[in-house]
């Protein structure tokens, strides 16, 4: 039984003239004539003028297409079973149930996609290029859920299109636009994940915000080109009945839209994820083997600055510099493994999304061109409606996949449901944590320049380092290191607070590391005393990983006074 047949209302009644009234289902007779009973599809129904069971009939032609009929005549004893009158329309109990189910379905799709968009907007650590593509997917699904599905559900419940021919064409075009944009977004995400897994360390420089914006603009341009075809006349002849509205089944357009909206993107998606699987399998083995050779996994990330003496370097200094080379190798290997594991996990999450997408959309894009080219192979109306709504179901299920597969999205969802959005002031836990006092360990001892004795450098001439931003946890009481003789540079366009939510964490990390490196290379303020006999020059700044407690203990610890005002810095 199709959705339109759910509106069928059967009643038996005797006419005032003694003849049998027609079984009114919106067909050619709701009591309007003759002894012969007629059946049809409900198109428009209004309670009869005199009979208890009379409804406004709708005439039916040989193809069982509906047209407005005449009010039913008087009928005695007419009875309507299992129906409800809503605004003058008679709807069966099953139709009411279908309407409630579709309303819950639409509300779930709207709420889920809104959660995805707000989660990225309110959490800085989720504002990455990959998540921008996910937000674009959520925007397309939200537009579909809010502008297309309500009218589709209304048509299913009423059994006919009640919004006019012009709006039918617009509705069909927006339907194709949103579905195509959603599918192309999944295609873009798969390419982005392949780049992230294949080039995990170079990914921030390869996939920039500017490139992402250009890709998204091209994506929506392609979706618009695919969707405007029927508006420009590439469609079937317009049916005379304005109460009928459906997707265009013209053979040429059906094949074109299926290729551009589904088959080509699906081919790219399958190829990209096959490549992701191959790269992930080989890279994981090589990285894990390298880390095992270097004894264990990363426990802590620290900043080590490799220095060399500008005049007479001691053996101790050269030994310290040589010993850090192994640490640098191990840290880069471990950091690469950690970075790659995050990329691989994100790829797994998005692979689930793509798998569900294929299951939801493949039946529709298989049946549509097949039925257009070979009408005799068309499925029944009921089967086609199930396949049609299965594609819509993809827009509802995408937001449900993220919290089940991504811990970060799950936490963001929970914070939003608890009305906790800390985007403006509170900072997330830093991805990297650098300890400035390890500069002393790398140099083989306290910095000697501008030092009056064997102790640390005087507090009047500290090494200028960027102070950490305010965090949720209180830090140790340390004085802010002044910068002598330097004017604060003006803010650049990228430093405006207005653009803060659109900056990637990797961009902030790179900027802070560069600033830290430049300030360390510049050294402290000019010293009023004689030039130091032994002055060190920074050779490199790197992130190192101690692999066990014993190795971490070999790095010399210093008291707070020996830090030369180097403080823990979040980068």
Curated annotation (Swiss-Prot):
Instruction: Report what the Swiss-Prot or TrEMBL entry states about this protein's PTMs.
Output: Palmitoylated. Palmitoylation by ZDHHC21 may increase the expression of the receptor and regulate downstream signaling.
Q: Which residues lie on this side of the membrane: Extracellular?
A: 1-94, 159-168, 238-250, 374-380
Q: Where in this protein does the record put region Disordered? A: 13-75, 465-487
Q: Where are the transmembrane segments?
A: 95-120, 133-158, 169-191, 213-237, 251-274, 349-373, 381-405
Comp. bias regions, Low complexity: 35-47
The listed locations are:
Cell membrane
List the carbohydrate attachment sites: 64, 81
Q: Which residues, by range, are in coiled-coil regions? A: none
> Can you list the GO cellular component terms from the UniProt entry?
plasma membrane
Give the Gene Ontology MF terms in alphabetical order: alpha1-adrenergic receptor activity
Biological process terms from the Gene Ontology for this record are:
adenylate cyclase-activating adrenergic receptor signaling pathway; cell-cell signaling; phospholipase C-activating G protein-coupled receptor signaling pathway; positive regulation of cytosolic calcium ion concentration; positive regulation of MAPK cascade; positive regulation of vasoconstriction
Q: Is this entry keyworded Transmembrane?
A: yes
Q: How does it sit in the membrane?
A: Multi-pass membrane protein
> Composition bias, kind Gly residues: at what positions?
19-34, 48-57
**Spans within the Cytoplasmic topological domain:** 121-132, 192-212, 275-348, 406-571
Lipidation residue positions, type S-palmitoyl cysteine? 419
Query: In terms of domain of life, where is this protein from?
Result: Eukaryota
Alphabetical UniProt keywords: Cell membrane, G-protein coupled receptor, Glycoprotein, Lipoprotein, Membrane, Palmitate, Receptor, Transducer, Transmembrane, Transmembrane helix
Query: Function of this protein?
Result: This alpha-adrenergic receptor mediates its effect through the influx of extracellular calcium.
Subunit details = Interacts with FLNA (via filamin repeat 21); increases PKA-mediated phosphorylation of FLNA.
| Family to which this protein belongs | Belongs to the G-protein coupled receptor 1 family. Adrenergic receptor subfamily. ADRA1D sub-subfamily.
User: What name has this protein been given in UniProt?
Assistant: Alpha-1D adrenergic receptor
* The organism of origin for this protein: Sus scrofa
